[in-house]
Curated annotation (Swiss-Prot):
Name of protein: Dihydrolipoyl dehydrogenase, mitochondrial
Swiss-Prot/TrEMBL site (Important for interaction with PDHX and activity of pyruvate dehydrogenase complex) positions: D448, Y473
Family annotation (InterPro entries): Class-I_Pyr_Nuc-Dis_Oxidored, FAD/NAD-bd_sf, FAD/NAD-binding_dom, FAD/NAD-linked_Rdtase_dimer_sf, Lipoamide_DH, Pyr_nuc-diS_OxRdtase, Pyr_nucl-diS_OxRdtase_dimer, Pyr_OxRdtase_I_AS
Organism: Canis lupus familiaris
Residues annotated with N6-acetyllysine modification: K66, K104, K122, K132, K143, K346, K410, K417, K420, K505
Length: 509
Protein backbone atom coordinates (compact mmCIF):
# COMPACT_ATOMS: atom_id res chain seq x y z
CA UNK A 1 0.00 0.00 0.00
CA UNK A 2 1.35 3.43 -0.92
CA UNK A 3 2.23 5.81 1.90
CA UNK A 4 0.03 8.91 2.18
CA UNK A 5 2.91 11.18 1.18
CA UNK A 6 3.35 9.24 -2.05
CA UNK A 7 -0.38 9.35 -2.75
CA UNK A 8 -0.41 13.11 -2.07
CA UNK A 9 2.52 13.70 -4.42
CA UNK A 10 0.88 11.54 -7.06
CA UNK A 11 -2.34 13.56 -6.87
CA UNK A 12 -0.44 16.84 -6.86
CA UNK A 13 1.39 15.87 -10.05
CA UNK A 14 -1.95 15.13 -11.69
CA UNK A 15 -2.98 18.67 -10.82
CA UNK A 16 -6.03 17.95 -8.63
CA UNK A 17 -5.00 20.25 -5.77
CA UNK A 18 -3.34 22.85 -7.96
CA UNK A 19 -6.49 23.21 -10.09
CA UNK A 20 -8.55 23.88 -6.99
CA UNK A 21 -6.14 26.32 -5.36
CA UNK A 22 -4.78 28.21 -8.40
CA UNK A 23 -7.89 28.19 -10.57
CA UNK A 24 -9.82 30.33 -8.10
CA UNK A 25 -7.34 32.97 -6.99
CA UNK A 26 -9.22 35.77 -8.72
CA UNK A 27 -12.56 34.91 -7.13
CA UNK A 28 -13.62 37.14 -4.25
CA UNK A 29 -15.16 35.67 -1.09
CA UNK A 30 -16.19 39.01 0.44
CA UNK A 31 -19.92 39.09 1.35
CA UNK A 32 -22.02 41.88 -0.11
CA UNK A 33 -24.32 44.15 1.88
CA UNK A 34 -27.43 44.57 -0.23
CA UNK A 35 -30.94 45.94 -0.18
CA UNK A 36 -33.88 43.68 -0.97
CA UNK A 37 -34.28 45.17 -4.47
CA UNK A 38 -30.58 44.83 -5.34
CA UNK A 39 -29.51 41.39 -6.62
CA UNK A 40 -26.59 39.57 -5.02
CA UNK A 41 -23.94 38.20 -7.37
CA UNK A 42 -22.57 34.79 -6.39
CA UNK A 43 -20.45 31.96 -7.70
CA UNK A 44 -22.32 29.30 -5.70
CA UNK A 45 -25.78 29.55 -4.16
CA UNK A 46 -26.74 26.74 -1.80
CA UNK A 47 -30.44 26.21 -1.07
CA UNK A 48 -30.73 24.67 2.39
CA UNK A 49 -28.46 24.82 5.44
CA UNK A 50 -28.71 21.28 6.77
CA UNK A 51 -25.59 19.10 7.18
CA UNK A 52 -25.10 18.89 3.42
CA UNK A 53 -25.92 22.51 2.64
CA UNK A 54 -24.01 24.35 5.33
CA UNK A 55 -20.90 22.17 4.92
CA UNK A 56 -21.00 22.66 1.14
CA UNK A 57 -21.36 26.43 1.60
CA UNK A 58 -18.37 26.63 3.94
CA UNK A 59 -16.23 24.42 1.70
CA UNK A 60 -17.16 26.47 -1.36
CA UNK A 61 -16.13 29.68 0.42
CA UNK A 62 -12.87 28.07 1.53
CA UNK A 63 -12.14 27.21 -2.10
CA UNK A 64 -12.55 30.86 -3.04
CA UNK A 65 -16.11 30.85 -4.35
CA UNK A 66 -18.33 33.81 -3.52
CA UNK A 67 -21.00 31.83 -1.68
CA UNK A 68 -24.60 32.41 -0.62
CA UNK A 69 -26.69 30.03 1.50
CA UNK A 70 -30.48 30.40 1.45
CA UNK A 71 -32.41 28.92 4.39
CA UNK A 72 -36.20 29.06 4.86
CA UNK A 73 -36.13 28.52 8.63
CA UNK A 74 -35.05 31.10 11.19
CA UNK A 75 -32.15 28.97 12.41
CA UNK A 76 -29.42 27.23 10.44
CA UNK A 77 -28.72 23.49 10.59
CA UNK A 78 -31.77 21.96 8.93
CA UNK A 79 -33.80 19.05 10.29
CA UNK A 80 -30.77 17.24 11.72
CA UNK A 81 -29.66 20.01 14.02
CA UNK A 82 -33.03 21.53 14.94
CA UNK A 83 -35.52 18.65 15.09
CA UNK A 84 -33.57 15.49 14.28
CA UNK A 85 -30.16 13.98 14.99
CA UNK A 86 -28.96 16.46 17.59
CA UNK A 87 -31.98 16.94 19.91
CA UNK A 88 -32.76 13.22 19.75
CA UNK A 89 -29.22 12.36 20.91
CA UNK A 90 -29.59 14.73 23.85
CA UNK A 91 -32.78 12.95 24.92
CA UNK A 92 -31.32 9.51 24.27
CA UNK A 93 -28.31 10.29 26.45
CA UNK A 94 -30.25 11.87 29.30
CA UNK A 95 -33.00 9.26 29.29
CA UNK A 96 -30.30 6.59 29.57
CA UNK A 97 -28.89 8.29 32.67
CA UNK A 98 -32.37 8.47 34.17
CA UNK A 99 -32.99 4.82 33.36
CA UNK A 100 -29.74 3.80 35.08
CA UNK A 101 -30.52 5.87 38.17
CA UNK A 102 -34.18 4.91 38.38
CA UNK A 103 -33.60 1.19 37.88
CA UNK A 104 -31.24 -1.16 39.69
CA UNK A 105 -28.16 -0.28 37.65
CA UNK A 106 -26.74 2.39 39.96
CA UNK A 107 -27.52 0.34 43.07
CA UNK A 108 -25.58 -2.63 41.65
CA UNK A 109 -22.57 -0.32 41.31
CA UNK A 110 -22.76 0.79 44.93
CA UNK A 111 -24.47 4.09 44.14
CA UNK A 112 -27.50 4.34 46.40
CA UNK A 113 -30.02 7.12 45.87
CA UNK A 114 -32.99 7.75 48.13
CA UNK A 115 -35.14 9.39 45.47
CA UNK A 116 -34.88 9.83 41.71
CA UNK A 117 -37.27 12.25 40.05
CA UNK A 118 -37.68 13.17 36.42
CA UNK A 119 -37.73 16.87 35.61
CA UNK A 120 -38.83 16.65 31.98
CA UNK A 121 -38.89 20.41 31.55
CA UNK A 122 -35.23 20.64 32.61
CA UNK A 123 -34.31 17.75 30.32
CA UNK A 124 -35.93 19.53 27.38
CA UNK A 125 -34.13 22.72 28.36
CA UNK A 126 -30.73 20.98 28.18
CA UNK A 127 -31.65 19.64 24.74
CA UNK A 128 -32.62 23.12 23.54
CA UNK A 129 -29.43 24.65 24.95
CA UNK A 130 -27.32 22.20 22.95
CA UNK A 131 -29.29 22.90 19.77
CA UNK A 132 -29.05 26.67 20.24
CA UNK A 133 -25.29 26.51 20.76
CA UNK A 134 -24.77 24.46 17.61
CA UNK A 135 -27.05 26.54 15.37
CA UNK A 136 -25.24 29.63 16.60
CA UNK A 137 -21.99 27.87 15.81
CA UNK A 138 -22.96 27.52 12.15
CA UNK A 139 -23.86 31.21 11.97
CA UNK A 140 -20.41 32.01 13.38
CA UNK A 141 -18.73 29.70 10.84
CA UNK A 142 -20.62 31.44 8.03
CA UNK A 143 -19.29 34.81 9.17
CA UNK A 144 -15.80 33.41 9.67
CA UNK A 145 -15.75 31.94 6.16
CA UNK A 146 -17.59 34.89 4.57
CA UNK A 147 -20.65 32.93 3.49
CA UNK A 148 -23.63 35.24 2.87
CA UNK A 149 -26.72 33.93 4.70
CA UNK A 150 -30.10 34.83 3.19
CA UNK A 151 -33.14 33.93 5.29
CA UNK A 152 -36.06 33.04 3.01
CA UNK A 153 -37.69 30.32 0.93
CA UNK A 154 -35.35 29.69 -1.99
CA UNK A 155 -36.76 29.02 -5.44
CA UNK A 156 -34.82 28.58 -8.67
CA UNK A 157 -36.21 31.23 -11.02
CA UNK A 158 -33.71 30.73 -13.81
CA UNK A 159 -30.70 28.62 -14.73
CA UNK A 160 -28.52 31.21 -13.03
CA UNK A 161 -30.93 32.74 -10.56
CA UNK A 162 -32.39 31.98 -7.13
CA UNK A 163 -35.12 34.10 -5.55
CA UNK A 164 -35.57 33.96 -1.78
CA UNK A 165 -39.00 34.90 -0.45
CA UNK A 166 -38.70 36.29 3.07
CA UNK A 167 -41.16 36.07 5.94
CA UNK A 168 -42.29 39.67 5.44
CA UNK A 169 -43.17 38.96 1.80
CA UNK A 170 -40.16 40.75 0.32
CA UNK A 171 -37.80 38.94 -2.03
CA UNK A 172 -34.06 38.75 -2.53
CA UNK A 173 -32.72 37.85 -5.97
CA UNK A 174 -29.37 36.07 -6.26
CA UNK A 175 -27.67 35.93 -9.66
CA UNK A 176 -25.37 32.95 -9.50
CA UNK A 177 -23.04 30.85 -11.63
CA UNK A 178 -23.86 27.60 -9.84
CA UNK A 179 -26.84 26.40 -7.79
CA UNK A 180 -26.67 23.58 -5.24
CA UNK A 181 -29.95 22.08 -4.01
CA UNK A 182 -29.58 20.74 -0.46
CA UNK A 183 -33.15 21.02 0.81
CA UNK A 184 -33.19 17.70 2.68
CA UNK A 185 -36.30 15.71 3.49
CA UNK A 186 -39.56 15.82 5.42
CA UNK A 187 -41.64 13.32 7.38
CA UNK A 188 -43.56 10.86 5.20
CA UNK A 189 -47.27 11.15 6.11
CA UNK A 190 -49.29 8.05 6.95
CA UNK A 191 -52.40 7.73 4.75
CA UNK A 192 -55.55 8.46 6.74
CA UNK A 193 -53.74 9.61 9.91
CA UNK A 194 -53.42 13.34 10.56
CA UNK A 195 -50.38 14.42 12.56
CA UNK A 196 -51.21 17.20 15.04
CA UNK A 197 -47.84 17.13 16.90
CA UNK A 198 -49.80 16.87 20.14
CA UNK A 199 -51.04 13.32 20.63
CA UNK A 200 -50.44 12.06 17.08
CA UNK A 201 -46.86 13.08 16.47
CA UNK A 202 -44.01 12.79 14.01
CA UNK A 203 -40.39 12.62 15.14
CA UNK A 204 -40.55 16.42 15.53
CA UNK A 205 -43.39 16.30 18.06
CA UNK A 206 -41.87 13.32 19.87
CA UNK A 207 -38.87 15.49 20.74
CA UNK A 208 -41.02 18.02 22.60
CA UNK A 209 -43.73 16.13 24.49
CA UNK A 210 -44.86 17.99 27.62
CA UNK A 211 -45.25 14.85 29.71
CA UNK A 212 -44.36 11.18 29.61
CA UNK A 213 -47.25 9.26 28.04
CA UNK A 214 -48.64 6.29 29.91
CA UNK A 215 -48.85 4.30 26.68
CA UNK A 216 -47.20 5.04 23.34
CA UNK A 217 -47.57 3.25 20.02
CA UNK A 218 -44.84 3.72 17.42
CA UNK A 219 -45.61 3.03 13.77
CA UNK A 220 -42.31 1.70 12.44
CA UNK A 221 -39.40 -0.04 14.18
CA UNK A 222 -36.66 1.40 11.99
CA UNK A 223 -33.86 3.65 13.22
CA UNK A 224 -36.01 6.64 14.23
CA UNK A 225 -38.79 4.49 15.69
CA UNK A 226 -36.56 2.49 18.03
CA UNK A 227 -34.53 5.56 19.05
CA UNK A 228 -37.48 7.74 20.02
CA UNK A 229 -39.42 4.78 21.37
CA UNK A 230 -36.42 4.03 23.61
CA UNK A 231 -36.38 7.59 24.96
CA UNK A 232 -39.96 7.45 26.19
CA UNK A 233 -39.78 3.82 27.32
CA UNK A 234 -36.80 4.68 29.54
CA UNK A 235 -38.66 7.66 30.97
CA UNK A 236 -41.57 5.45 32.00
CA UNK A 237 -43.92 4.97 29.04
CA UNK A 238 -45.29 1.59 27.99
CA UNK A 239 -44.08 1.51 24.37
CA UNK A 240 -45.15 -0.81 21.56
CA UNK A 241 -43.68 -0.56 18.07
CA UNK A 242 -45.72 -1.88 15.14
CA UNK A 243 -43.51 -2.89 12.21
CA UNK A 244 -44.58 -4.09 8.76
CA UNK A 245 -41.31 -5.97 8.23
CA UNK A 246 -40.21 -9.02 10.18
CA UNK A 247 -37.26 -7.35 11.91
CA UNK A 248 -36.24 -4.21 13.80
CA UNK A 249 -33.56 -1.70 12.84
CA UNK A 250 -34.60 -0.81 9.31
CA UNK A 251 -32.89 -1.37 5.97
CA UNK A 252 -29.28 -2.61 5.83
CA UNK A 253 -29.02 -4.07 9.31
CA UNK A 254 -27.55 -7.59 9.55
CA UNK A 255 -30.30 -10.04 10.56
CA UNK A 256 -28.25 -11.75 13.28
CA UNK A 257 -27.54 -8.36 14.82
CA UNK A 258 -31.20 -7.35 14.45
CA UNK A 259 -32.45 -10.42 16.32
CA UNK A 260 -30.03 -9.87 19.19
CA UNK A 261 -30.87 -6.16 19.25
CA UNK A 262 -34.59 -6.89 19.48
CA UNK A 263 -34.00 -9.36 22.31
CA UNK A 264 -32.06 -6.76 24.33
CA UNK A 265 -34.69 -4.05 23.77
CA UNK A 266 -37.45 -6.43 24.81
CA UNK A 267 -35.51 -7.23 27.97
CA UNK A 268 -35.53 -3.48 28.68
CA UNK A 269 -39.34 -3.42 28.31
CA UNK A 270 -39.76 -2.31 24.68
CA UNK A 271 -42.58 -4.27 22.98
CA UNK A 272 -42.77 -5.18 19.29
CA UNK A 273 -45.44 -6.38 16.89
CA UNK A 274 -43.58 -7.44 13.75
CA UNK A 275 -45.06 -8.46 10.39
CA UNK A 276 -47.94 -6.20 11.34
CA UNK A 277 -49.54 -3.21 9.64
CA UNK A 278 -51.52 -0.25 10.96
CA UNK A 279 -54.84 0.18 9.17
CA UNK A 280 -56.05 3.32 10.93
CA UNK A 281 -56.17 5.44 14.07
CA UNK A 282 -59.14 7.07 15.79
CA UNK A 283 -59.11 9.75 18.47
CA UNK A 284 -61.61 9.08 21.25
CA UNK A 285 -63.57 11.59 23.32
CA UNK A 286 -61.26 11.03 26.31
CA UNK A 287 -58.25 12.04 24.21
CA UNK A 288 -56.85 8.54 23.85
CA UNK A 289 -56.19 6.97 20.46
CA UNK A 290 -57.37 3.60 19.16
CA UNK A 291 -54.82 2.18 16.73
CA UNK A 292 -56.17 -0.55 14.44
CA UNK A 293 -53.67 -3.22 13.37
CA UNK A 294 -53.62 -6.56 11.57
CA UNK A 295 -51.09 -8.98 10.09
CA UNK A 296 -48.99 -7.61 7.24
CA UNK A 297 -50.49 -10.17 4.88
CA UNK A 298 -53.94 -9.99 6.41
CA UNK A 299 -55.43 -11.77 9.38
CA UNK A 300 -57.11 -11.04 12.67
CA UNK A 301 -57.66 -7.34 13.39
CA UNK A 302 -56.71 -5.86 16.74
CA UNK A 303 -56.97 -2.48 18.46
CA UNK A 304 -54.27 -0.97 20.69
CA UNK A 305 -55.16 2.08 22.78
CA UNK A 306 -52.52 4.68 23.55
CA UNK A 307 -52.03 8.24 24.79
CA UNK A 308 -49.52 9.18 22.09
CA UNK A 309 -49.15 7.76 18.58
CA UNK A 310 -45.73 8.29 17.00
CA UNK A 311 -45.58 7.98 13.20
CA UNK A 312 -42.11 6.89 12.03
CA UNK A 313 -42.52 5.39 8.57
CA UNK A 314 -39.64 7.23 6.96
CA UNK A 315 -38.90 10.48 5.20
CA UNK A 316 -39.34 11.81 1.67
CA UNK A 317 -37.27 14.33 -0.33
CA UNK A 318 -38.26 17.98 0.14
CA UNK A 319 -38.46 19.28 -3.43
CA UNK A 320 -41.75 21.19 -3.51
CA UNK A 321 -41.91 24.69 -4.95
CA UNK A 322 -38.22 24.79 -5.87
CA UNK A 323 -38.94 25.68 -9.50
CA UNK A 324 -37.75 22.33 -10.84
CA UNK A 325 -40.77 21.77 -13.09
CA UNK A 326 -40.30 25.12 -14.84
CA UNK A 327 -36.69 24.16 -15.57
CA UNK A 328 -37.66 20.75 -16.94
CA UNK A 329 -35.97 18.81 -14.12
CA UNK A 330 -38.14 15.74 -13.53
CA UNK A 331 -38.11 13.70 -10.32
CA UNK A 332 -37.65 9.93 -10.18
CA UNK A 333 -40.51 7.65 -8.98
CA UNK A 334 -39.41 8.17 -5.35
CA UNK A 335 -39.45 11.95 -5.63
CA UNK A 336 -35.66 12.33 -5.83
CA UNK A 337 -33.66 14.56 -8.16
CA UNK A 338 -31.67 12.56 -10.74
CA UNK A 339 -27.98 13.53 -10.83
CA UNK A 340 -24.81 12.23 -12.46
CA UNK A 341 -21.63 11.17 -10.64
CA UNK A 342 -20.66 14.83 -10.20
CA UNK A 343 -24.09 15.62 -8.66
CA UNK A 344 -25.16 17.62 -11.71
CA UNK A 345 -28.80 17.63 -12.76
CA UNK A 346 -29.78 17.73 -16.44
CA UNK A 347 -28.81 21.42 -16.24
CA UNK A 348 -25.01 21.23 -15.70
CA UNK A 349 -24.66 24.24 -13.36
CA UNK A 350 -27.50 23.08 -11.09
CA UNK A 351 -26.42 20.43 -8.59
CA UNK A 352 -28.20 18.41 -5.89
CA UNK A 353 -26.97 16.49 -2.83
CA UNK A 354 -28.19 14.80 0.34
CA UNK A 355 -31.70 13.54 0.97
CA UNK A 356 -33.03 14.90 -2.35
CA UNK A 357 -30.85 12.47 -4.34
CA UNK A 358 -30.47 8.68 -4.27
CA UNK A 359 -28.76 6.93 -1.38
CA UNK A 360 -29.28 6.64 2.37
CA UNK A 361 -30.85 9.66 4.08
CA UNK A 362 -27.96 10.28 6.45
CA UNK A 363 -26.46 13.57 7.61
CA UNK A 364 -22.87 12.40 7.16
CA UNK A 365 -23.58 11.13 3.65
CA UNK A 366 -24.94 14.60 2.78
CA UNK A 367 -21.84 16.25 4.30
CA UNK A 368 -19.50 14.12 2.18
CA UNK A 369 -21.52 14.83 -0.95
CA UNK A 370 -21.50 18.56 -0.20
CA UNK A 371 -17.72 18.70 0.12
CA UNK A 372 -16.87 16.68 -2.98
CA UNK A 373 -19.61 18.37 -5.04
CA UNK A 374 -18.10 21.83 -4.60
CA UNK A 375 -14.60 20.42 -5.06
CA UNK A 376 -15.91 19.11 -8.36
CA UNK A 377 -17.15 22.60 -9.27
CA UNK A 378 -13.56 23.76 -8.72
CA UNK A 379 -12.26 21.13 -11.13
CA UNK A 380 -11.41 18.45 -8.60
CA UNK A 381 -12.27 14.76 -8.53
CA UNK A 382 -15.60 13.62 -7.09
CA UNK A 383 -14.90 10.30 -5.34
CA UNK A 384 -17.45 8.64 -3.05
CA UNK A 385 -18.04 5.00 -2.16
CA UNK A 386 -21.50 4.57 -0.64
CA UNK A 387 -20.50 1.13 0.62
CA UNK A 388 -18.23 2.94 3.09
CA UNK A 389 -20.96 5.13 4.59
CA UNK A 390 -21.69 3.91 8.14
CA UNK A 391 -25.10 3.70 9.83
CA UNK A 392 -25.76 4.03 13.56
CA UNK A 393 -28.75 3.47 15.85
CA UNK A 394 -28.17 5.48 19.03
CA UNK A 395 -30.09 3.35 21.51
CA UNK A 396 -28.40 1.58 24.41
CA UNK A 397 -26.73 -0.59 23.42
CA UNK A 398 -25.91 1.14 20.15
CA UNK A 399 -26.01 -0.61 16.78
CA UNK A 400 -23.67 0.36 13.95
CA UNK A 401 -22.66 -1.11 10.64
CA UNK A 402 -20.77 -0.35 7.45
CA UNK A 403 -20.33 -2.36 4.27
CA UNK A 404 -22.23 -5.51 3.39
CA UNK A 405 -24.45 -7.66 5.60
CA UNK A 406 -24.44 -11.46 5.44
CA UNK A 407 -27.75 -11.34 3.60
CA UNK A 408 -26.34 -9.00 0.93
CA UNK A 409 -23.22 -11.13 0.43
CA UNK A 410 -25.34 -14.27 -0.01
CA UNK A 411 -27.59 -12.46 -2.47
CA UNK A 412 -24.57 -11.27 -4.48
CA UNK A 413 -22.95 -14.71 -4.44
CA UNK A 414 -19.77 -13.52 -2.73
CA UNK A 415 -17.86 -16.11 -0.69
CA UNK A 416 -17.11 -14.77 2.76
CA UNK A 417 -15.90 -15.69 6.23
CA UNK A 418 -17.15 -14.48 9.61
CA UNK A 419 -15.35 -13.39 12.75
CA UNK A 420 -17.24 -12.60 15.96
CA UNK A 421 -16.31 -11.39 19.41
CA UNK A 422 -18.77 -10.81 22.30
CA UNK A 423 -18.48 -7.81 24.58
CA UNK A 424 -18.97 -10.25 27.48
CA UNK A 425 -15.34 -11.30 26.85
CA UNK A 426 -14.04 -7.72 26.65
CA UNK A 427 -12.35 -6.49 29.83
CA UNK A 428 -13.45 -2.84 29.52
CA UNK A 429 -17.07 -3.89 28.97
CA UNK A 430 -16.77 -6.14 32.03
CA UNK A 431 -15.43 -3.34 34.22
CA UNK A 432 -18.25 -1.10 32.97
CA UNK A 433 -20.83 -3.83 33.67
CA UNK A 434 -22.11 -3.24 30.15
CA UNK A 435 -21.59 -6.46 28.23
CA UNK A 436 -24.56 -6.89 25.89
CA UNK A 437 -23.75 -7.38 22.21
CA UNK A 438 -20.87 -8.30 19.94
CA UNK A 439 -18.69 -7.31 17.00
CA UNK A 440 -19.21 -9.21 13.76
CA UNK A 441 -16.75 -8.95 10.86
CA UNK A 442 -17.32 -10.21 7.32
CA UNK A 443 -14.21 -10.81 5.22
CA UNK A 444 -13.72 -11.99 1.65
CA UNK A 445 -12.77 -15.65 1.67
CA UNK A 446 -10.18 -15.42 -1.11
CA UNK A 447 -8.47 -12.12 -0.21
CA UNK A 448 -9.20 -11.54 3.51
CA UNK A 449 -10.43 -8.04 2.60
CA UNK A 450 -12.99 -6.55 5.01
CA UNK A 451 -16.44 -6.55 3.39
CA UNK A 452 -18.61 -5.53 6.31
CA UNK A 453 -18.59 -4.74 10.02
CA UNK A 454 -21.61 -5.01 12.31
CA UNK A 455 -21.47 -3.90 15.92
CA UNK A 456 -24.06 -4.24 18.67
CA UNK A 457 -22.88 -2.88 21.97
CA UNK A 458 -21.50 0.05 23.96
CA UNK A 459 -19.69 2.62 21.85
CA UNK A 460 -20.69 1.00 18.56
CA UNK A 461 -21.25 4.39 16.92
CA UNK A 462 -17.65 5.40 17.61
CA UNK A 463 -16.09 2.03 16.81
CA UNK A 464 -17.74 1.75 13.39
CA UNK A 465 -15.59 4.61 12.11
CA UNK A 466 -12.51 2.40 12.41
CA UNK A 467 -14.34 -0.10 10.22
CA UNK A 468 -15.30 2.61 7.71
CA UNK A 469 -11.64 3.64 7.44
CA UNK A 470 -10.67 0.01 6.84
CA UNK A 471 -13.24 -0.39 4.07
CA UNK A 472 -12.35 2.94 2.44
CA UNK A 473 -8.71 1.94 2.07
CA UNK A 474 -9.22 -1.75 1.30
CA UNK A 475 -7.77 -3.17 4.52
CA UNK A 476 -7.74 -6.88 5.22
CA UNK A 477 -8.95 -8.47 8.44
CA UNK A 478 -5.31 -9.30 9.20
CA UNK A 479 -4.32 -5.64 8.74
CA UNK A 480 -6.68 -4.67 11.55
CA UNK A 481 -5.79 -7.68 13.69
CA UNK A 482 -2.12 -6.65 13.62
CA UNK A 483 -2.77 -3.06 14.73
CA UNK A 484 -2.01 -2.60 18.44
CA UNK A 485 -5.16 -1.46 20.25
CA UNK A 486 -4.93 0.18 23.69
CA UNK A 487 -5.91 -1.99 26.68
CA UNK A 488 -8.40 -2.03 28.22
CA UNK A 489 -10.72 -0.54 25.59
CA UNK A 490 -13.98 -1.55 23.96
CA UNK A 491 -12.29 -1.31 20.55
CA UNK A 492 -10.21 -4.38 21.40
CA UNK A 493 -13.38 -6.32 20.61
CA UNK A 494 -13.13 -5.00 17.05
CA UNK A 495 -9.54 -6.23 16.79
CA UNK A 496 -10.48 -9.63 18.24
CA UNK A 497 -13.33 -10.08 15.75
CA UNK A 498 -10.89 -9.39 12.91
CA UNK A 499 -8.48 -11.92 14.42
CA UNK A 500 -11.30 -14.46 14.38
CA UNK A 501 -12.17 -13.63 10.77
CA UNK A 502 -8.57 -13.76 9.51
CA UNK A 503 -7.11 -16.62 11.57
CA UNK A 504 -10.22 -18.53 12.59
CA UNK A 505 -9.84 -17.81 16.31
CA UNK A 506 -9.68 -14.82 18.61
CA UNK A 507 -7.38 -14.67 21.64
CA UNK A 508 -9.78 -13.91 24.48
CA UNK A 509 -12.79 -15.95 23.46
Amino acid sequence: MQSWSRVYCSLAKRGHFSRISHGLQAVSAVPLRTYADQPIDADVTVIGSGPGGYVAAIKAAQLGFKTVCVEKNETLGGTCLNVGCIPSKALLNNSHYYHMAHGKDFASRGIEMSEVRLNLEKMMEQKSTAVKALTGGIAHLFKQNKVVHVNGYGKITGKNQVTAKKADGSTQVIDTKNILIATGSEVTPFPGITIDEDTIVSSTGALSLKKVPEKMVVIGAGVIGVELGSVWQRLGADVTAVEFLGHVGGVGIDMEISKNFQRILQKQGFKFKLNTKVTGATKKSDGKIDVSIEGASGGKAEVITCDVLLVCIGRRPFTQNLGLEELGIELDPRGRIPVNTRFQTKIPNIYAIGDVVAGPMLAHKAEDEGIICVEGMAGGAVPIDYNCVPSVIYTHPEVAWVGKSEEQLKEEGIEYKVGKFPFAANSRAKTNADTDGMVKILGQKSTDRVLGAHILGPGAGEMVNEAALALEYGASCEDIARVCHAHPTLSEAFREANLAASFGKSINF
